[in-house]
Amino acid sequence: MFKNDEEYFADKEYISNSMIGDYLKSPAYYEAKHVSKIIPKQSSPAMVLGLALDCMLTEGLNVFGMTYSKQCLKRDNPELFEQNKTGAFEVLTEAAWNQIHTMAGLIEELPLYKEIKDKADKQVILTGQFGTGYKVKGKLDFLVVENDTAYIYDLKTSSVIKPIQYHYHCLDYGYYRQMAMYKNLVIQNYKVKKVVCKHIVINKDPWWNKCSVFTLNEDRIDKEMNTITDTIRNINAKAFDEVFEEHEIGEEKEASTFGLKEIDLL
């Protein structure tokens, strides 16, 4: 379907989780970014860090080396300095370059990563349909299919890594919704009855790195299905008028609402 990342991210016919997130942020923002295209594509330092880490761990050092380069001064490395000016590479600061290598090294020591790195399909692009023919897409970091069970593993960098805080982080960033999309796409494309969804998470503190693996609760994931369907329906209906919202805040949530479990630590 999509030959490369450029085609995948440029396509607007198929709806992705990140596009749904943009609509939920603001219908008018979605229209400006994906329809009128007056908002340029932007990458925050956190996004660059996460994408570079994904590249190293899912596509390997060779691809990483053809995609990314380390920033340097001309007097320190004239050849690399000129190479970086060509625009052929995503140039990372020395701090980001070192941090990515440190984070990747820690993840590579994780027992779960050692278990899946050779048997998993990596950077798996899937397409399918939601509801009454709405086209959707997703890109999975790792996918393992064993008999009638599929295992989705997604790499995440995060400023929080404890279970309760990470649960709310998942809510803020739409990660349960993302896994609902992925789960549905896997079921459409593979003959499986069960899908297990896990996050391999490393905190992005430059001075202290720690890994955790979280299993996302299946019921909590499934709760996102209505949100996905309703949002895609609104996008296809071109419902881009801004909606005024009023909320009451401060209610304490019960622990039973937490949707994940920490299963492995380094």
Located regions from the model:
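Short catalytic/ligand-binding loop motif for oxyanion handling, primarily in non-cytosolic enzymes
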Residues: 65, 160-163, 207-209
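Metal-dependent nuclease catalytic regions and adjoining charged, substrate-binding loops involved
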Residues: 94-104, 171-176, 181-266
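A residue-level signal for conserved active-site and pocket-lining positions in enzyme catalytic cores
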Residues: 53-54, 142, 228
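Hydrophobic/aromatic-lined pockets within catalytic cores
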Residues: 57-61, 157-160, 187-191, 236
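Secondary-structure boundary elements
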Residues: 110-118, 144-151, 186-195
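Metal-dependent nuclease catalytic cores that hydrolyze phosphodiester bonds in DNA/RNA
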Residues: 1-138, 246-249, 253
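Non-catalytic protein-protein interaction segments used by genome-maintenance enzymes to assemble
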Residues: 125-176
